[in-house]
């Protein structure tokens, strides 16, 4: 049966001001392990390779899976990340390519080259939907997916919502574009945005319409993934509630919510959603079996 693994971002464990009690990298690993996460994601925009390598013993000590979020601009940048992925036995490398080619054809050639190199090194890579990257634009990315049918996608919709200044309710053309992305999603990242803010507080009343929208998107994406996934496939969902300046702060510089608590809230939402989909499939199978007996 397909499995859900929820990862927490080490970058999100940056305590900021007033976010959560973690005071060290090791304490962050302990918190994540004790909270029942399957693994931790290293963000190479927040730490260089040397600093990231220092976390290797903690992955072993706390028996957590590893995801690497990388920001290469060339094949020369990709190669050391693939080496690191092998040494960390990373489940996947999320590529946020720091290149924005002018044409889909040019982008598709780059993506295929990087995919081929990763395949040679036996490393699983996915391209994350992210601003200021090869997947910067929603429409451009759907065209790129058509050009590269085997391109794997790690979907963070928060970037497209704020990039396009999306308003609710969605227009039909927006719904169709988001649906194309969700149909190709191989993994998901958890952050909720609006058309004006990249990261919203999860429990503020004024943000609930966006919470509902993102939960609807994640449910649709999960359903698409489960339909095409092998019976032993694993879906990775990464909670990534980032520190300031992603997180909003008041005039005193203090964050307006506790991101660690919000990560646990989001983790609970995703677990509940997954269980509901599993229950639906089991009930549907039982019904079909009864009809054939």
Where are the model-predicted features located?
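Active-site acidic/histidine proton-transfer and metal-coordination neighborhood
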Residues: 65-153, 162
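Hydrophobic faces of well-ordered beta-strands that scaffold small-molecule active sites
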Residues: 2-13, 40-42, 64-70, 93-95, ...
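Flexible glycine/acidic-rich beta-alpha junction loops that bind and position SAM and/or redox cofactors
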Residues: 15-16, 162-165, 192-207, 233-252
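Acidic/histidine-rich catalytic cores of soluble enzymes
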Residues: 120-205
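A short, acidic, amphipathic alpha-helical segment used as a generic capping/interface helix at domain edges
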Residues: 173-176, 210-234
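Active-site-proximal loop/turn and secondary-structure-junction residues that shape catalytic pockets
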Residues: 10-12, 44-46, 72-74, 97-101, ...
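Charged helix-capping and loop-helix junction motifs
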Residues: 22-24, 79, 105-113, 138-139, ...
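N-terminal pre-domain/capping segments
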Residues: 1-86, 90, 268-293
């Amino acid at each position: 049966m397909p499995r859900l693994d929820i990862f927490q971002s080490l970058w999100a464990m940056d305590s900021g001001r007033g976010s959560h009690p973690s005071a060290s990298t090791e304490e962050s690993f302990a918190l994540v392990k004790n909270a029942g996460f399957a693994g931790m994601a290293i963000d190479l925009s927040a730490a260089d390779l040397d600093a990231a390598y220092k976390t290797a013993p903690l992955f072993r000590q706390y028996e957590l899976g590893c995801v690497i979020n990388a920001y290469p601009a060339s094949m020369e940048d990709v190669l050391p990340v693939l080496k690191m992925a092998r040494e960390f036995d990373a489940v996947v490398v999320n590529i946020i390519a720091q290149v924005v080619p002018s044409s889909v054809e040019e982008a598709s050639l780059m993506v295929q080259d990087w995919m081929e190199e990763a395949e040679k090194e036996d490393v699983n890579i996915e391209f994350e939907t992210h601003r200021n990257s090869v997947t910067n634009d929603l429409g451009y990315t759907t065209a790129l997916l058509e050009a590269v049918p085997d391109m794997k996608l790690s979907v963070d919709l928060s970037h497209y919502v704020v990039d396009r200044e999306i308003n609710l309710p969605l227009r039909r053309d927006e719904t169709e574009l988001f649906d194309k992305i969700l149909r190709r999603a191989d993994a998901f990242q958890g952050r909720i945005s609006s058309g004006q803010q990249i990261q919203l507080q999860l429990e503020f009343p004024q943000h609930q319409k966006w919470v509902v929208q993102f939960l609807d998107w994640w449910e649709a994406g999960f359903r698409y993934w489960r339909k095409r996934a092998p019976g032993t496939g694993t879906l990775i969902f990464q909670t990534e509630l980032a520190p300031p300046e992603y997180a909003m702060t008041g005039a005193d510089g203090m964050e307006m919510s506790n991101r660690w608590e919000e990560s646990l809230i989001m983790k609970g939402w995703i677990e509940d959603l997954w269980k509901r989909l599993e229950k639906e499939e089991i009930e549907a199978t039982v019904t079909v079996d009864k009809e054939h007996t």
